[in-house]
Amino acid sequence: MAEKSYQAGVKEYRKTYWTPDYVPLDTDLLAVFKIVAQAGVPREEAAAAVAAESSTGTWTTVWTDLLTDLDYYKGRAYRIEPVPGDDNAFYAFIAYPIDLFEEGSVVNVLTSLVGNVFGFKAVRSLRLEDIRFPLAYVKTCGGPPNGIQLERDRLNKYGRPLLGCTIKPKLGLSAKNYGRAVYECLRGGLDFTKDDENINSQPFMRWQHRFEFVMEAVHKATSETGERKGHYLNVTAPTPEEMYKRAEFAKSLGAPIIMHDFLTAGFTANTGLANWCRENGMLLHIHRAMHAVLDRNPMHGIHFRVLTKCLRLSGGDHLHSGTVVGKLEGDREATIGWVDLMREPFVPENRARGIFFDQDWGAMPGVMPVASGGIHVWHMPALTAIFGDDACFQFGGGTLGHPWGNAAGAHANRVALEACVEARNQGRPVEREGREILTEAAQHSPELKIAMETWKEIKFEFDVVDKLDTGPMLRVVNA
C-alpha cells in the first residue's frame, strides 16, 4: 500500500483559510461579507468557510491539493470586524489572488464570490457588501462603451443634468401612439425618452414597429428644436442573436442610444453588447430591473454598490441609481457613495457612505447615474443638489401626468431644471431654497405652475429598508 503523504479527513476551515497576519497585495481582489454564523460556529471558522468555498476549498481534504500551490491560490480571511448595532452579524474581509479569475470576466468573479457559498449551511445569512477590484484587473475589462464626456460631446450638451422620461403606460400602447408620446416629450424640452424595462416585443407592439415610429419621432423633434435627441430603444431579447439583430436595426435607423436590462439578461450578454456599442459608436443605457431581489435585504444577497462596480466593468454608459427622494428604495449617503463609484476615477474608502475599500478605476470612463422613479418638479432642487451635473433625471409620470399633456409636462421639467441650475451657479443653496426658486420660475411658466399645483402633496416618505450600518467601527482583535 502506498504511503499517505497527506492527512485525509475533515478539518476546520480556519486551520487553512483564516490568516489574520496576512497583508493584502495591491493585486489581490478584496471582498467584505456580512455574515451571521450558525449557532455554535465561531466567527473565524465561518469567515474561513466563506473564503474556502469561494476559492479553492471543499468539504474534505483531497489528495489533489498536493498537485498545486494551494497556499498561493486560496482565498484568505484576514480580518473580522463587528457590524455596528448588531451583535449577531460581523464583517469578514477576504483576499483572493488575482489569478483565480479570468481576465475581463465579471461572470467568473461573481460565480466564485456569490456562487455555492451563499447556500452554505455554516452561515445563516451572507451578504457581499463590497469588492475592491485591483487596478490590474480593471485594466482587463472593457468598461463603458463611451463614458460621460464622450456622450456630452456627441449630444453637444454641457453644464446641466440631462432630462428624460419613461413612456407610460409601460405596456399596452400601439407603436404609433407610443411614437406620438415620444415626439411630444422631446419637443417639449426633454433630451431623452425611454422604453420601460419590460417593453421588448409583445403582441400589442412588436419591436420593429416601435423602433420605426420612435425614431421618426426622434428625428422630427431634433429637426424642430435644433437639439440632439434620443430614445433608449430596449434591445433586451430572448437570445443574444436576437439582441444583436435589434441593435443593428436601431443603428440602421440612426438611433444614438440603445438600452439593456443587464441583470435579467445577464453579464455575458451585457458585456457583449457593450463591446458592440463601442465598435459601432452607440451609447448604452442600462436598466437595473431585478436588482432589489439581490440587494434590498440588508442581511443576505449582494449590495447594490457591488452591482454598480460590476456594471462599470462589464460596460454601460447610463445606469439607474435610485433617486433618494422618489418612490424607490435608496439611502442618501449610500446612494451618493455608489454614484461616486459610477463616475469618479478614484474613490477612497468612506465607511460613512458604505465604501469599505479604495477603488482605483484608472483611465476607465465613468457611468452616468440615472435618477428615475416617482420624481416630479418638486424634487428638482434636491436632485440637482444630490447628483450635480453629470446625471440624467427621468420623469415618467412626472411628465406624462401633466394636466396639459406630455409636451407641457416636459416643458415644466426643463424650466424647473434650468431654474435650479441657474440658482446653483449663483451660489444659492438650491435644496434649502427650492420652493422659492421654483415659485420664481413658475411666474414665467404656466406649465411649471400647473405641475407644481398638481404634485404639491405627493411624497414618498417611507423608511429605508437597507440602511447603512451605523455606529462606531471597532475592529475585532484577531485571535
UniProtKB/Swiss-Prot annotation:
Cofactor(s) this protein cannot do without: Mg(2+)
Q: What Enzyme Commission number does this protein have?
A: 4.1.1.39
**Which positions, given as ranges, span the membrane?**
none
- Cofactor note from UniProt? Binds 1 Mg(2+) ion per subunit.
Question: Which keywords are on file for this protein?
Answer: Calvin cycle, Carbon dioxide fixation, Lyase, Magnesium, Metal-binding, Monooxygenase, Oxidoreductase, Photosynthesis
Binding annotation for substrate: 116, 166, 170, 288, 320, 372
Gene Ontology biological process terms from the UniProt entry: reductive pentose-phosphate cycle
Query: Catalytic site residues?
Result: 168, 287
Which Pfam family is one of those matched by this entry?
RuBisCO_large
**What is the protein name given in its UniProt record?**
Ribulose bisphosphate carboxylase large chain 2
Which lineage do the record's taxonomy fields give for this organism?
Bacteria, Pseudomonadati, Pseudomonadota, Alphaproteobacteria, Hyphomicrobiales
